[in-house]
């Protein structure tokens, strides 16, 4: 089970999701949100080429922090060659800086089918991570608490 294997590799780490600026940019955002809500796990997502102009500089600072990060590079069969090259080089750079780097390739096929498969994979990934952490993926107590506190402020709708 590929989603379960990836979940085991990501368990206990801060997860960075990197994708091209095409269709998988939305998938990376979806995966991030599912990891937050279901697995109760901090995650971050960014897309190339923009991340290679800014975020990559954040990897320069040496230290133990990078060893607690797992990068998942998401590839799409329709990625332009220059985008794929950027993703490969960015993953290699993160690995040299101490992060664990994993790759995920969307299956070939029509775009809608690829996106549906990618979303499904991320949903399963988030559920497996929740199970590994012993977390119930359904309740969202921090959001509920935030809404209660927000509603307690005069004139602020929840």
Roles of regions detected by a PLM:
Residues 1-158:
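A SIS-like phosphosugar-recognition module
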């Amino acid at each position: 089970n590929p989603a379960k294997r990836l979940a085991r590799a990501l368990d206990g780490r801060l997860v960075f999701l990197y994708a091209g600026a095409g269709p998988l940019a939305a998938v990376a955002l979806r995966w991030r949100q599912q990891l937050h809500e279901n697995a109760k796990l901090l995650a971050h997502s960014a897309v190339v080429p923009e991340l290679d102009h800014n975020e990559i500089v954040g990897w320069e600072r040496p230290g133990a922090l990078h060893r607690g990060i797992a990068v998942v590079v998401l590839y799409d069969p329709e990625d332009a060659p220059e985008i794929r090259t950027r993703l490969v080089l960015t993953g290699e750079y993160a690995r040299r800086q101490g992060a664990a780097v994993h790759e995920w390739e969307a299956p070939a096929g029509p775009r809608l089918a690829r996106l549906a498969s990618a979303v499904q994979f991320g949903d399963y990934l988030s559920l497996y991570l929740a199970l590994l952490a012993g977390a119930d993926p359904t309740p969202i107590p921090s959001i509920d608490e935030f809404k209660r506190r927000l509603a307690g402020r005069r004139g602020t709708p929840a």
